[in-house]
Each structure stands twice: as C-alpha cells, then as structure tokens.
C-alpha cells in the first residue's frame, strides 16, 4: 500500500540503539505480564484465590491493556512512539508499586489493571515507529525479534523469579520492577527519534480522514480478527497463566517443577521468534506469504492441544514438553501482526496495530477468565478436577478451530501483503 507520510529510515547504528531502548521496555512488559503464572501458587495460598479469581487477576492486566488500544493507536499516529511510551510507563510504575503494597484481592486486581494500562504501548509503539523508521524488508524481522525479546522477559519471569521469591519475597520484587521501568523510560527518552507530524495529512482531502472505521472495515483485518482473539489471545493466556495450573493440578508437578517447565517453554518460544526473524525474509523471497504460512502451520497447534487434552493426567512429566510444542506451533499467528500493519499506509499503522492488539488482549482476558469460570463451573457440577480442566480446554479448542475456519473461508477475497 502506498504511504501518505514520508519515511525517514534510520542508519544501521541508530536503528540498533532505538531497537535496544524499546526492546528493554518490552522485555519488562513481558516479564510483568507473565509473572502471575510463577506467582500463582503463592498468591492462591496467601489470598485464598479460586480458579476464577486467579483467571480474573491474570486477566486484569490484559483488560487494562485492551482498554487503551483504540486511543493508543490515535495517539501513536499523532504524537509518535516516544512521547506516548513515556507517559504510559509512568502508569506502569504506579501499577508495580500498587501491587507491591496490595493487601487484598481487589488491591491486586487494581494494580494489575494499572500495569496493563501502563505497559500497553511497549510493543505497539516501536512497531508503529518501525513502520516509518525501518525499510520494509526489515519490518517482519524487527517484529519477530521484538517478540523474541518478549520471550526473554517471560523466561525471566519463571525460574529467576522462583529463585528470588525465598530471598526477597514478591513484594520487594515488584519494587525492583518499578525501578527498572523507570530505567526503561530513561533509555527511550534518550534514543527514540522525534516524530514528524504531517499537518497536511490531517487538514485536507478525503484521504486525510480515514481512521478506525477504515481499519475495521478492511477485509484483511476482518479475516484476521477471530484468530487474533481466540488463537493469538488464547496462546498468550495459556503461556501466561493456565499452563502452570495444568502442570500442577492435572500433570502432578510441584510448583518448582512447573516453574522449570515454564522456563523451558519460554526458552522454546524465544528460539521460535528468533528463528522467524531469521527465516521469514528468506521465505518471503520465495513466495511464502504470511497468509500461506499461517494457513499451513496453524493446524499443528490444534492437533497438539487435542493430544494434551486427551492425555490428561497421563501425560505426566511430558506435560511441559507438550505445552512448549503447542505454544511454539502457535507462533505462526505472530506473522499476522506485522502483515496487518503493512496492509495500511504508515499514517494508519498505529491504529491498525492497536486495533489488532485490542483483539489479542481482549482475547487473553476472555480466555484466562473464561477457562477459570468453566473449571469452577464444572467442579460445581461434581466433575473431577482433571476432567473439569479437560472440558474447559476442549471448549477453547473448538473456538480456535472455528476462528481458523473463518480465516480460510475469507482469505481468498483479501489482498494480503507479501
């Protein structure tokens, strides 16, 4: 698609420095996002949380995240990544401090909501900037490597957190995270380029007026929407919450064993995103579009999740491996995010990305809380715990297959980017 805003590609050195600054902020965002999975046994015991409480607590972060996405896109397009991220990260600092000081479930939930709001720009802001600062053939790679950095954050949220817990406790941990977010603010303020606003793009001509309506009506965006909600959002919900309770309460892991399993799962995800960053430019040159890769790759995730469900408690020590393979197979859907951005001109990239992100994180919230509600509901009907987990996951699996089927039936009518 033709841009209506002139690009200003950075030199290699400046591009690396900008990437590092935003990547550190996103590292912290992913760490804080995923930390509830490692803390779930401790928080469940300390605050007497039910499955739906735990799902709501983890989902509260994503509710805050999703709530900002539509205004975030407009602000990014208008004010640029630097200014927006700095204001948002101030809210993230407040969220970390509030979590450290919380003495009730409602206090924890409010703190997670604030953290979600404050960290909600950490991926969309750099991706919006990369749309203008980086050459087109570098954008898929930059996106995959940002997700790889996020996986580093998720790795840091597992065993390192588990090791620190007996030494300092979870409250001190969140004070430290607040300090690191402040450091990230300094790095972004130092390295992020000034955002050039083009006045003519807002004042004249019918082409200057498109906004969220143009994004949500776009056939390519609409074909991707159900998968963003159920598949991408659901995979994040598994990785950041329900994998750990499954390993403990279905497969019989101890909390430490589950933390080790989650650590290696996140290492596997890190490796997957690194591999995508290396492989996608080569695949694209040979005609393998994002659509084609998603079409051919996603069924593997459905097969793996079905095997996990059917195996139940019989999967034993292989639970961590199975969940790692499932999450890795879901990384095909990560190709959709930069593809959606590239389907729009750069002056709409922020709104396109934030709209897509809204669907992802609304999906994370819905799946995290919905699975908790389903588990508690089936338990209330007298089901055994393992069976309740299996049925809740089966319902989720059916939704993901339906989302994929919708994509297959509509994609032939879309004009997806290469």
Task: Map each language-model feature to its residues.
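Conserved MFS/SLC helix-loop-helix module at the cytosolic interface between two early adjacent transmembrane helices
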Residues: 67-106
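Juxtamembrane intracellular "pre-TM" segments in multi-pass secondary transporters
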Residues: 3-11, 194-225
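Intracellular juxtamembrane helix-capping segments at the cytosolic ends
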Residues: 121-134, 331-345
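Helix-breaking motifs and short loop linkers at transmembrane-helix boundaries and internal kinks
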Residues: 48, 80, 101-107, 118, ...
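Extracytoplasmic gate region of multi-pass secondary transporters
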Residues: 36-37, 219-277, 364-372
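Helix-loop-helix hairpin linking two adjacent transmembrane segments in secondary transporters
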Residues: 145-194
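Extracytoplasmic
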Residues: 17-51, 238-244, 367-371
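Cytoplasmic helix-loop-helix junction between adjacent transmembrane helices
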Residues: 111-149
